[in-house]
Amino acid sequence: PSSSNLPKQFNLLYVKTINEEIIILLKDIDSDSYPRLHILKYSQSLEDELKKASLDLKNGVKTIGEIDTSISNNHYGITFRKIKKNIPVK
């Protein structure tokens, strides 16, 4: 697991809750580095946010994770927003 801070923007790849921890695998959007595992302390609001994002991921909805403590209801400031698909004009 990474000991670095969460990136400002990221793609969520995987989520697993084990006991009092939530393990997430994510890819930093602003970096060419490999995806990293982060272990977060459990909270109900964080789990709810990550479950919604995981469901979107399974349903093929493109989302971006962001850190914004001003609008988030969890300790880490994690929020997700949906990205519209850009379809080229024919």
Each model region followed by its residue ranges:
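Charged, low-complexity intrinsically disordered regulatory/assembly segments
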Residues: 17-20, 62
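Soluble periplasmic/extracytoplasmic beta-strand elements of cell-envelope proteins
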Residues: 14, 23-27
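Alpha-helical transmembrane signal-anchor/signal-peptide segments
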Residues: 1-18
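Extracytosolic and intramembrane catalytic regions of membrane-associated proteins
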Residues: 27-90
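Hydrophobic residues embedded in beta-strands of well-ordered beta-sheets
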Residues: 20-22, 32
